[in-house]
């Protein structure tokens, strides 16, 4: 059984009655959140979670080969009412689903960051990156502040990306099927609109 534990570590909390739970989660660089869970990211020297809220005892935390997933068990699926503080050493990819909310009060400063929001979820960050890749879909929303030299953004299916306060040198933006993208671009933008998508440019482009 030991070799299985190296591939996937699952922390099931449903057997505990306490509502305030803290645990180490091991090394990871990819994060996925489900079920309306609210997650605050905090840069740290350790990888750990602090879980509170009505459904904290029904939270499942799974780390498989550096991919960390946090969700509720089947009985409480989609219920939300769970707050997580995630202390992390490194993170390169953040994905949210099913009404989850992921945010950070601190600036995420690193070379590259990949953000994906799906199915009514929301993400909100201050960033300082060289490469920023952003995708929103199916009614989700992403709010971005700070700066990134290059920003590649795709929005679709009624989703929103609000990046008016994100300073860029170059941006590639695609909006389709009723999605809305709001951008501020310092130097250059390549914009593509399809099937009722909207891209609002809040500064002049320079060629």
What are these regions (language model features)?
Residues 1-207:
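Intrinsically disordered, low-complexity terminal regions
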């Amino acid at each position: 059984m030991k070799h299985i534990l190296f591939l996937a570590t699952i922390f099931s909390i449903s057997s505990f009655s306490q509502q305030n739970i803290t645990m180490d989660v091991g090394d990871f660089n990819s994060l996925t959140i489900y079920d309306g869970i609210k997650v605050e990211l905090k840069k740290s020297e350790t990888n750990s979670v602090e879980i509170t809220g009505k459904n904290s005892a029904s939270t499942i935390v799974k780390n498989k080969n550096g991919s960390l997933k946090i969700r509720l068990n089947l009985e409480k699926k989609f219920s939300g009412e769970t707050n997580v503080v995630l202390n992390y050493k490194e993170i390169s990819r953040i994905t949210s689903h099913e009404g989850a909310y992921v945010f950070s009060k601190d600036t995420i400063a690193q070379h590259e960051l990949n953000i994906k929001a799906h199915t009514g979820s929301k993400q909100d960050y201050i960033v300082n990156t060289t490469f920023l890749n952003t995708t929103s879909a199916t009614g989700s929303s992403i709010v971005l502040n700070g700066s990134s030299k290059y920003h590649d953004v795709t929005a679709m299916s009624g989703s929103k990306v609000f990046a008016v306060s994100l300073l860029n040198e170059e941006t590639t933006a695609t909006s389709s099927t009723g999605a809305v993208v709001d951008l501020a671009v310092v130097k250059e933008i390549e914009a593509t609109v399809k099937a009722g998508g909207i891209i609002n440019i809040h500064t002049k482009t320079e060629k």
